[in-house]
C-alpha cells in the first residue's frame, strides 16, 4: 500500500535512536496506520533491510554479475559503475547498508542475520563470477575466490564510509585506481 511504501522508503538513518513517533510524523501517517503494517519498530527494521537494502544491493551489485561476458570485466564494470552512480546525497551520507551494519548490526540477532544474508548473497555472486573467470582463463586459478569476494565487498563498503568522513571525491578516485590495480593483479596472463 501507499502507507507501507511511505514508511519503508523514509530516510531511516539513525534508525536505532529514531522513535516510532518520529517515523509516524515523517511519513504523515497515524500510529494506527503504522501498527497496521508493523507490529514493532524491529519488524519495520527487518522490512527496511529486506525491501530497501537487499533490493538495492541485488540490483546494483549482484544482478550485474550474472550477465554474460568476461568475468573480470563484469567485476570491474559493476564496482566502477556503482561508484560513479552515487549521488551527492549518497556520497555525503554513506552507504545505507554499511550505516545499518554499524548502527544496528550488533544489537539484535534478527537484524544481524538479515544483514549477513545480504552479504552472503553478494559474496556468493562474486565467488561464482570469479570461479567462472577461472574456468574461462581470465582470472588466475591460484587465488582464493572467497578471500577476493570478502576483500572486494569490504573495500567497497569501507570507501563509502571514508568518502563520507572526508567529504572528498578524491577518495573515490583513489579507490577506483586501487580497485583497477587489484583486479589487474588477479587477471590471468
What is the meaning of each model-derived region?
Residues 2-10, 82, 156:
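Short hydrophobic clusters on alpha-helical segments that form packing/core surfaces
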Residues 9-47:
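Helix-turn-helix
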Residues 47, 62-93, 145-152:
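Hydrophobic alpha-helical connector segments
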Residues 50-57:
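Short, basic, alpha-helical segments at the C-terminal edge of helix-turn-helix-like DNA-binding modules
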Residues 74, 88-110:
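Amphipathic alpha-helical segments used for helix-helix packing
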Residues 77-85, 120-136, 150, 155, ...:
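C-terminal peripheral helix-coil segments that are non-catalytic and often amphipathic
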